[in-house]
Amino acid sequence: MARLLEYYRDTVTKELTQKFNYKTVMEVPKITKITLNMGVGEASTDKKIIENAVSDLEKISAQKPVVTKARKSIATFKVRQGYPVGCKVTLRGVKMYEFLDRLVNVAIPRIRDFRGIQVKGFDGRGNFNMGIKEQIIFPEIDYDKIDKVRGLNITVTTTAKTDQEARALLSAFKFPFKN
């Protein structure tokens, strides 16, 4: 079992129950899924770019990504319907908690000039979005073997009803938010 899953069951549920006065443990918000999305705009001209992005995301998430395709043609971006434009992975269960552990304890401290995560990433319904500018902050990516530095979006979907509950949940998992 993942270390953070045990930590959630033992510590986080008790903290949040006291803080928000929940009547049952089932009311305590939990993380349902984490989605990693890597948009690759240059993939329409070169197929090798999308393959490299897929391999990077597979190393980061330890799960095979799905290639996302353009929904409609846009002439100004030289994109046709059905062209690959990125890749994404949805993590749930044990793999989700293992990725969250690596993200908070290893990857985020490796970000250059890091001063905390912006709080404006919450969407009003208890979900959190953050962007990462370089995939090289993850230890699974070998700096010498990458062709280009790419960013990715991380979406943390929770069962929290408000942003305050979601922020308390993620803070309990040691997310370093700005004050």
From Swiss-Prot:
One of its GO terms (molecular function) is structural constituent of ribosome. One of its GO terms (biological process) is translation. It comes from the Bacteria. Keywords: Ribonucleoprotein, Ribosomal protein, RNA-binding, rRNA-binding, tRNA-binding. InterPro entries: Ribosomal_uL5, Ribosomal_uL5_bac-type, Ribosomal_uL5_C, Ribosomal_uL5_dom_sf, Ribosomal_uL5_N. One of its GO terms (cellular component) is ribosome. This is one of the proteins that bind and probably mediate the attachment of the 5S RNA into the large ribosomal subunit, where it forms part of the central protuberance. In the 70S ribosome it contacts protein S13 of the 30S subunit (bridge B1b), connecting the 2 subunits; this bridge is implicated in subunit movement. Contacts the P site tRNA; the 5S rRNA and some of its associated proteins might help stabilize positioning of ribosome-bound tRNAs. Part of the 50S ribosomal subunit; part of the 5S rRNA/L5/L18/L25 subcomplex. Contacts the 5S rRNA and the P site tRNA. Forms a bridge to the 30S subunit in the 70S ribosome. Belongs to the universal ribosomal protein uL5 family. This is Large ribosomal subunit protein uL5.
